[in-house]
Each structure stands twice: as structure tokens, then as C-alpha cells.
């Protein structure tokens, strides 16, 4: 549907063929590497280091982001506590459940207090209990920053999103009326989905 391409454009991994992506009125291409300070990314693939402990992984990611150790020492315990990983911080990542790994990926995205969080299929492969937990975490972050997440799971969007965009064949669908009806609780998001896609696949 073009979801991965759109996410790569927003994160700066791809450059648009035409048009521009703006942050506070500035082209992200002109912002250069400083743009990366504004974003935290939770990728779809859980590419973690199985022999690292959770805590070591966060310190490693903090170093890659250019954070000094003093600041990392302040942030990492807070993040581990927020994501309910303090008791597991010294366990090897290979011992983590899928939900714990996802929380750890969210933790690295939170390092250095980004103003934009980007999630790509954040609940893929999780059991229902883990999915609800991750969804609740994402909802909590939206109070003080921009949260963008791409998913095929309608229930995740229904519970966690305040704005919805539909992608089909790489194009954004003109769905302002339908999404406004959803926000006004005149219809469900599932009904909006069926209106546009029927039995086809989609990205949100």
C-alpha cells in the first residue's frame, strides 16, 4: 500500500521524488542530521542483540545517539521503570518475550526525549494481552508529543488514534468525511475500512 515507503520518507531514510516534508515549517532535508534528534523510531522488525541485557542495549543505543553517559544514567532507569522492565534489565534479550522486546524497542526510541515517535506495526506478532499493553503505552505518549503509527490492525487504531489516514496503492485516500464521522462516533472505524476496501488489505 506504500506504508513502508511513507515511513521511510518521514524518518529521512528516503528522499521524496517531488514535494517536501516539513517540521515546524522547515524542510527536513535542510535540517540534516539535527532532524534525527526530533524523532524516535520503533521499527517493525525486532532487530535486537540477543546476548545483550536490556540495560546494556539501551546504553548502547544511547551512545549511538550521541548521549553522554551522565544523561543516559538519568534517562535509562526512568525508561526501564516506565515500561515495566526494571526487573528484567539484567536478563539477556534472548530470554525476553515478544512484548518485552517491543517495550525495549520503545525504550530506545524514547532516549533523548524526541518530540516525534514513529511506530511501524507496533503490535505485530504479539498476543492479545501484549497488544493491549503496547497500545496503552502508545496512547500515553500522545499527550506531550506527536505519535505516528502504521498498522493493519483496525482495533489498535480504534483505541489509540485521534487522526487516521488511509493508504491504497501508495496514495492517501480522500476520507475526511468518513473519518470525521468516526471521530463524531457516528460510525466505527471498521465500517469506514469496509467502505473503502471491502475485503482488500489496507494500511492505516
Stretches found by the model and what they are:
Residues 59, 63, 70-88:
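Conserved ABC ATPase "signature" region
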Residues 19-30, 34-35, 174-176:
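Conserved ABC transporter NBD signature motif
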Residues 131-143:
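Helical segment within the ABC ATPase nucleotide-binding domain
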Residues 117-121:
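Catalytic Walker B motif of ABC-type/P-loop ATPase nucleotide-binding domains
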Residues 171-194:
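Conserved beta-strand-loop-alpha-helix hinge in the C-terminal portion
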Amino acid at each position: 500500500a506504500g506504508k513502508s515507503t511513507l515511513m521511510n520518507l518521514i524518518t529521512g531514510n528516503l528522499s521524496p521524488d517531488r514535494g517536501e516534508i516539513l517540521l515546524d515549517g522547515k524542510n527536513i532535508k535542510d535540517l540534516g542530521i539535527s532532524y534525527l534528534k526530533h524523532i524516535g523510531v520503533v521499527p517493525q522488525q525486532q532487530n535486537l542483540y540477543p546476548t545483550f541485557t536490556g540495560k546494556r542495549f539501551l546504553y548502547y543505543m544511547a551512545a549511538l545517539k550521541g548521549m553522554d553517559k551522565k544523561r543516559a544514567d538519568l534517562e535509562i532507569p526512568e525508561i526501564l521503570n516506565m515500561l515495566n522492565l526494571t526487573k528484567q534489565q539484567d536478563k539477556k534479550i534472548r530470554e525476553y518475550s515478544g512484548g518485552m522486546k517491543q517495550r525495549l524497542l520503545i525504550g530506545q526510541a524514547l532516549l533523548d526525549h524526541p518530540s516525534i515517535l514513529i511506530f511501524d506495526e507496533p503490535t505485530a506478532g504479539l498476543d492479545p494481552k501484549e497488544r493491549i499493553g503496547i497500545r496503552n503505552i502508545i496512547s500515553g505518549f500522545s499527550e506531550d508529543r506527536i505519535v505516528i503509527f502504521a498498522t493493519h490492525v483496525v482495533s489498535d487504531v480504534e483505541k489509540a488514534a485521534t487522526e487516521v489516514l488511509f493508504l491504497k496503492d501508495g496514495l492517501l485516500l480522500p476520507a475526511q468525511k468518513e473519518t470525521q464521522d468516526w471521530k463524531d462516533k457516528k460510525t466505527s472505524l471498521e465500517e469506514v475500512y469496509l467502505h473503502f476496501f471491502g475485503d482488500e488489505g489496507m494500511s492505516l
